[in-house]
Structures are given as structure tokens and as C-alpha cells.
Amino acid sequence: MAADERLGMGDKPVLLPGGNPQIAKGYGDAPVQAYIAAMPGWKSDIGRRLDAIIERTVPNVHKAVKWNSPFYGIEGQGWFLSLHCFANYIKVAFFRGAALRPVPPVASKSQDTRYFHIGEHDTLDEAQFAAWVKQASRLPGEDL
């Protein structure tokens, strides 16, 4: 394997253990779309749906890929959400998720953060997800 492939810089990104794409750090829509395109199997379709819901809900959302995960935020207010692929699900992290109503279902080691996991056969409640995104975008974000 060439060095650029190991580093995720070739035409086909490397999948890290658990299936998360290795995408170089970058700001804007392009690196996030590269991440979504590199999500394995069914996860790419869900990633596109999540990204579209986020864009519709927060029209001027700022995007970046950091630590091999897409981040979504508000300029000058920090990041409110990130995505990460695992073997059997996509983890959506709401950095101020404990303040959302209803609270996203999965707890975190961080008191403020809550997660929402989406598996291959799960039904995505788009209205609930959009409601969480809207609420999260109005809270102070994380400066990561």
C-alpha cells in the first residue's frame, strides 16, 4: 500500500478500524462530502440524508472534517454536532444534547453530550432529527 493510500489521500480513502473513513482535516462542504462518499455501504446513503436534513434545518451551517469526523456548527458559536461511523451504526453526537428535548437516547461520558445511533435497519425519524438539529444549533457550541 502506498503512503498516500495509508494516509487517506489516494482516490479511495482508507477505512479505519470500525469502518470510519480516514479523511484529511478540512473546512467547508467539500471534505464533508468526501467523508460521506467514503462511508461504507448503507452508511453513505444515511450520511447524505443526515447532511441534507442539517442543511435544510440550518441553512448557513458551517462544516468541517476534524479527527476523521464531519462537524457541523455556527460561525462564531462553535460546533453543535458530529458524525462518526462504527461497524454497525452511525453515531450522531450532540455536544449539548442533555439540553435537547426529548433528550437523545444514548448517554456519554461527558455530562452535556448525548448520542443518537442509526443502524442499517433503523428507521430515521427525520422530523425528530431535524428538531434536535434546530435546538442544538441554537445552543452555545463547542470550540473544538
Task: List where the protein language model places each region.
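Charge-dense, helix-prone N-terminal extensions
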Residues: A2-L144
